[in-house]
């Protein structure tokens, strides 16, 4: 009984939570429970991976704080509260690259778009700030540019294994 309790405690009471209470299909709930409860280590990041996650998270937070301070009241569709999106996208792209993916297209709503453009796609701070100042410079094929968060962007992303996607 102690082993079962320890296993369940380690699975469900750690630093990462799982929200499956809203799932209504029994087979889907069973799938998640089996995956969660059969794994000894759900996530085991190396020190290098942890540093990259922290760096990406920090970039996202600092960018949001700066925009919120510099452009008070400006419509920017902040990612505040959802900054983990940035290291998550970084992880998804890195994992995809390891499986042979060579190109990624990101389509998303306005919320967090500027942060993704800068911290995932590599759009420069200068380009974003120029757009805030009304100096829209860029490729006209990357969106109509009527507002800063409609502008598109294309780049090469460098993965943690120095691959370009």
What kind of region is each of these model predictions?
Residues 1-85, 101:
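Extended, charge-enriched "interface" segments that sit outside catalytic cores
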């Amino acid at each position: 009984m102690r082993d079962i309790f320890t296993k369940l405690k380690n699975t469900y009471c750690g630093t990462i939570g799982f929200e499956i209470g809203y799932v209504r299909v029994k087979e889907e709930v069973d799938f998640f429970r089996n995956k969660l409860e059969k794994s000894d280590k759900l996530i085991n990041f190396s020190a290098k991976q942890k540093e990259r996650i922290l760096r990406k998270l920090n970039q996202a937070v600092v960018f949001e704080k700066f925009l919120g301070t510099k452009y008070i009241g400006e419509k920017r569709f902040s990612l505040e509260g959802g900054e983990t999106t940035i290291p998550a996208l970084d992880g998804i792209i890195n994992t995809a690259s390891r499986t042979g993916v060579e190109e990624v297209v990101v389509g998303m709503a306005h919320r967090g778009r500027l942060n993704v453009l800068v911290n995932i796609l590599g759009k420069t701070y200068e380009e974003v700030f120029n757009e805030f100042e009304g100096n829209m410079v860029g490729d006209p094929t990357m969106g109509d540019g009527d507002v800063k968060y409609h502008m598109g962007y294309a780049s090469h992303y460098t993965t943690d294994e120095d691959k370009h996607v």
